[in-house]
Amino acid sequence: MPQFDESFLSDCALADRWHFYSYTVKQLPPHPSPKPNRNRNPYPSGASHDDHQHQLHHHHHQQHHHNHHRLWKTQRQSWSPRDTNNNHSLTSNNCNCNSSNTCNSISATGNTLHSIKFHRRRKYKKLARLALSTPAIPLQMDVDVDVNVTVDREFDMEMDTPVPLKNAVCHGSISSPSTPGTCSSGIGVGGGGCSSSSNNSINSGSYSTACTPPPPTHQHHSQHQQLQGTPGGSSRVGGAGAGGGGGVPPAPPSAGSSGHKNSLKGTKLARRARSFKDDLIEKISLMRTTNNTLGRSHSPHSPRTKHGTKAPPTTEEVLRSTQTLETHVKDISNALKHFRDVILKKKLEVLPGNGTVILETIASMYSVIQTYTLNENSAIMSSATLQVYQSLGKLIKLCDEVMLSEDSGECASLSNENVREVIDLLEDAVRNLVTLAQGKLKEQDQCAFRYSGSGLGGIGAAAEIMGAVTASPGASVPGTGVMRVSAAESAAQRTSLPDIALTPKERDILEQHNVNPMRGSHSTESILRDTSPPPKPPLPNRASNPPPLPPKRRSQPSASAGTVGVGCSSSTSTSNQASPLPYAQSHNISLNSDLDCSSNISLLNYGVDRLSVRSRSPDENSQCSFDSALNHSREEEDQQQQHQHLRSFPKLAAMMDEDMDKMVSYSAAIDDKTQTPLSTGGGIAGVAGGTGGAGEGVAAAASGDGETNSNRHSNESGFVSMREFRTSTQTTDYSVQSSTKSSSSNSEIAFSISESTAVGSSSEYQQISQLVSHSQRHISSSSSSCTTTTTSSSTTTGYGSSEVEQLQQQQQQQTTTTPADLAPALPPKSIQRSSLTRHDSPGVGDELDEVQSSSGWASHRSSQSEVAELRQLSPLHHLNHHPHTASAGQLQQWHSKHHSLIEGPRLQLAGSGSCSAFDQRHLDQEPPPLPIKKKHILAYMEICSASTRSIEQHRHTMHACNISRNISHSQTMNIMPMSKELSPELEMPPALPPKNYKQRKATSMVASPTLQPVIVTTPPPSPKPTLGENGSTGRPDSRMATVCEELNDAVASEDAMPEPRSPVLDSNENVSAVDDGQTFYCHSHQLPAAEMEMSEDASSADNQPITTPQVLEEQEEPTAESRPLVAVHESVKPANVDEDEEAERADMLINMLEEVNITRYLILKKREEDGPEVKGGYIDALIVHASRVQKVADNAFCEAFITTFRTFIQPIDVIEKLTHRYTYFFCQVQDNKQKAAKETFALLVRVVNDLTSTDLTSQLLSLLVEFVYQLVCSGQLYLAKLLRNKFVEKVTLYKEPKVYGFVGELGGAGSVGGAGIAGSGGCSGTAGGGNQPSLLDLKSLEIAEQMTLLDAELFTKIEIPEVLLFAKDQCEEKSPNLNKFTEHFNKMSYWARSKILRLQDAKEREKHVNKFIKIMKHLRKMNNYNSYLALLSALDSGPIRRLEWQKGITEEVRSFCALIDSSSSFRAYRQALAETNPPCIPYIGLILQDLTFVHVGNQDYLSKGVINFSKRWQQYNIIDNMKRFKKCAYPFRRNERIIRFFDNFKDFMGEEEMWQISEKIKPRGRRPVNY
């Protein structure tokens, strides 16, 4: 490397560039007070305190000489205090130095900048990597400190200096999180002057930049230090205020500079001490974030974030963003006005589109806010955003409800009050959010200005700060030691907690304990304001202190826990946000912005708190724990964890004894905080996040060293996940506290909870957490919550080391006792709250495949308490009245994600029975189960507002509304083979005969007047020999032909039915009527897991779902619609039901939807076998597998599933299962589960997109409305928009008039067969009239083109399910488009025959036959096999073929017929079709025939409950060609003249009439007559 590096050259340039900032000061006294050494410990190892004094003095003398040489006489003394790299005695040329304390020894002469750097490089050229930030601090340092303090105080008294130098010597700098890892730690740890990033990191080495000036004794140091901090907005504080390059002021930092130049790291020595890789990575990181002012600092080996933290927005960006937000607000306002006008003027057809516009505009507005991550961690922003989501969800739901209503004008949702309320709510919420966002942007602009280090832009701000602070130089009282706080500092310092003046007694206590004081959470502003040196760092190898920093730590986290009274800002949420108030008032903090943002740790992801050692990404909340205060790198934590977590409790006691005074100040701060208004946003009690962080630090201090690692692991998000719980509880003895702290670190609760945990019993902690959670649940103003917090925290401050023994015993007891012993009685809150506590078992993590040790139970409880409160406060509270069995871990994971979806999904999860398995697995370990857990309900299927009912009533609502349900659970039978007698389906009313679909349709319409009279879509069951004709007698056969048949195999008693058939819907559409007559769907996985157990619960008989096998005698009298079903139900309770087996099967069923890997539930083909990879599986397993397949080779499975699932499950069931799976995984934090949620949603969109008109029911559409509403409320606007677009399409299709065929046109006698060519008509037509052209007048090519266009139009309308279902049961009404297409085929064939037979002249007939042959040739070239075969069937029909034709015509027709020769299974046609490229219109008749053969020849099940997917695979392959051809369109243009000539082919004769004409032309047995 060159001798003169960048740092050296820039240092030289700086001397001249910034000379105008230098000013001459008085000479130092003979023995200046020592300053922290810039590179290493204040004292060289082995050097006495006196030596150090001499060294410093000599250094100043030497530096004066150097500056004289460099800047001549103009600024002889302006640089004097800068260089601490050359400390040596007046009497010696060299300093005592070692590897950990490097004093550059140079000759006393020739102290030029060149010689200084040269000797420094030469001396350390061969040195190994040195620990810049973790030297081996001598143990005698305490003695040195005391001596130093004595000397300092002597000088203080002489010079009237209020600031002692004790911390200046013993405490290092705390840098702001400017550049990743640019600052070494403090002097006691890193030699005092660590250089922060050149952009805008701020070190508080010996003095903080812009502090109140130090005493006159140290004017050189203070003034030049201020000078350094001023120009670049950053202070590189050396031992004597030394700047970057040994006595030369730092170069003006440029934007994006790496922070090496002009700083300690700019030296060769420092560069060698850092790895090249880290250097490179850091530079790349800074290049990516050009204005990376407050990024997180890194330990060299700590995992770096994948993306650099965002730079604060420039003024132009802020202005542009503000204007953009205002534009969006105007757009939203205009859209809402239009929305209101549309409703007032009853133009409801445009309402869905208007809702879409509003949704898109709000999504666009939110994307602007997200650009600056304004709500990343802000509780206020989160709350405002949730309000917008909730209001928007209501508006979208209003639009969709109006769409679904039969008479839109009479929809109840359109009442003026409701519309006004919905619109006003949304408008207010949007304005509130935008106002907050604009305020945050302005604060960020101020923040960027104050902290900006680019160029000299920060000089003015720093100078202003300096000027404001230097107003009261002597305000502090001499002799107060570490804790002295100047008036200016207390007035200008921004902390999370209000500044509290210390009493003399407190000062004495703190001074006595300042040997290892709590490290303050130094935000950048607090460092600017700090008039006293920060506390010194702890010494290594002490029982109460962790080991020193690792060598690679380049920036010391400033988000460390500290006491407020020390003058150290413990702010975490506000430290990085520029306060809008004047500096003198900034410590009060804008109460409506920062202080109440419990998790608003960093407005722009570049907050000081990102420096927490455990913070693994800029997106995490600040966790100001003691380990970050002690600057542990993650590597050191991991290495020392094994030793530290086994340390004895006496160490904890000693630490408690030393730090109890800190708790006094904390409690005082908390008491003061009670006056602070708070915000409860999104269910989070919002208090300044810094308070939680500080409290966390106290708890960490109390819990000892071993906690550092576990605490680090437990904060992936605001609430820890089960996985993180496991990590933390297994790592240390104090895991309960660490997990607890971390789980609540998002809010003020963390302070009280963690403190009480540190010095109190776990049961006390539980009560506190419950109390806090309870108070938060019942108040929206968090001030009372804060009061609770204060109470609990203040009760702990009186504990001393004697309480530590109690804590030890309780902790040890806690790790050995069962959770049941620890669980205190919960306050009688809502059922929802109680239901949560039931799952506070060690095994609760099973649902997430995680294991939680019993030692973490208390912390687990705490998180659940808080989560319970979160759920209570959730904006979707009205969706959430069904308590569910989700574990706290899931809820915690949900907390860091979207709020609403987990509510409905969780309820769905519970309702679906998935958690019942979990319940019963751990039932023996928990308190008695709540009855509500047995009602497995899907919250997102709710139609009625949950909030209008009491919990007891509402918990059964969805099942109670299923009274008239005819069948229960399509999957219960699909898990394992079992007899029908043991199936819960036996409790259902009897099914109808398999084939009588029209009658079933009629009865289903009668079943409930609230149901839409739409065509049912369920495939018919296959014939069953033992099933009685009326469906109410006989046992079903053990063979299950279809799933639908299985569902219909319910047994009823002979005397149960007042009518032969119960009013049921089609199979698998499990409809039930509640007492008010409303009908809802209850599907597949809703069977209660413990329904057998519930059957004995007489107290819950009210509103009991019919799926529960219980006699309904005690129930209220059912409505007329449900009475027949109830009568059936009373007598169908089975005799031999194994309850455990049933519950186990239901659990197994549900868990398939909740498992990521379901391969074990599938039957895969063997290597030697042919066919699909998946031969069969349970229904849920097939659904999950269809959502998971990603490979191209496996994609066919997904396509086959989507194509054929209607043959074994209802579309509404599939949608319900997919929404359940999505919402289950949506709340999980694991990547694979998030991926599963995305895959599930993709499949859901595919399924909805493929819904046909016959699939659509009001229940299915209502389900989609509810799910879209939940997506909007959870903030998934893009997904909601995607799904809603499909929904609008389907509603339009649903409302279209349904045409089932051309029966009227065919005179009621037309029939469509499998071949599609049979037909008869009673309409005799006449030849075209008037000006109509004749067939011969038109060109054959044009006729063929128009025929093809007509065919293609009908062909593209055919839905694939129609073809499958028609082949299965030949139900024409289920396949309207297929019906239309085949009838078009028939009419064309009859029209061609009629055209020929109506001609009396044989030559004319021959001309027409030749014309049709030409048309057929063109059709063949166009790949229109449908019209081709229609005309061929006409020419080859009996009435025409029997006539005499020329030999050429006969042979040509015969050759055409070879194409559809049936002798070899239509081999010729199949081969021709295989060689055909789209566009093509195939002959549908052959497809229907093939599908019929596959259906008849293959079973639906491989075994009971296991779907035979090979059969569906064959069906899919048959239909695949048809799907392929539907994608392409013909390029022809419509010719209306020819279309009118066709006249829809209505002009045809009937079969009988054509025979009569044919026989007239050629009588039987005679030659044809030419008439």
Swiss-Prot record:
Any one biological process term the GO annotation gives? sarcomere organization
Q: Where is the composition biased (Polar residues)?
A: 74-83, 287-297, 620-631, 708-718, 851-866
Q: Where are the Phosphothreonine modifications?
A: T524
Name the Pfam families on file. Answer: RasGEF, RasGEF_N
**Per the record, where are the segments of Pro residues compositional bias?**
532-550
List-wise, which residues carry Phosphoserine?
A: S496, S523, S526, S615
List the keywords (alphabetical).
Developmental protein, Guanine-nucleotide releasing factor, Phosphoprotein, SH3-binding
What does the tissue specificity note say? Answer: Ubiquitous.
Q: Which CDD domains match?
A: RasGEF, REM
Cite the Ras-GEF domain residue spans from the record.
1339-1564
Query: What InterPro entries is this protein classified in?
Result: Ras-like_GEF, Ras-like_Gua-exchang_fac_N, Ras_G-nucl-exch_fac_CS, Ras_GEF_dom_sf, RASGEF_cat_dom, RASGEF_cat_dom_sf
Pull one GO CC term from this UniProt entry: plasma membrane
Per the record, where are the segments of Basic residues compositional bias? 55-73, 298-309
Its function?
A: Guanine nucleotide-releasing protein that binds to SH3 domain of Crk. Transduces signals from Crk to activate RAS. Also involved in MAPK activation.
Protein name per Swiss-Prot or TrEMBL: Guanine nucleotide-releasing factor 2
Q: Which organism is it from?
A: Drosophila melanogaster (Fruit fly)
Gene symbol of the encoding locus: C3G
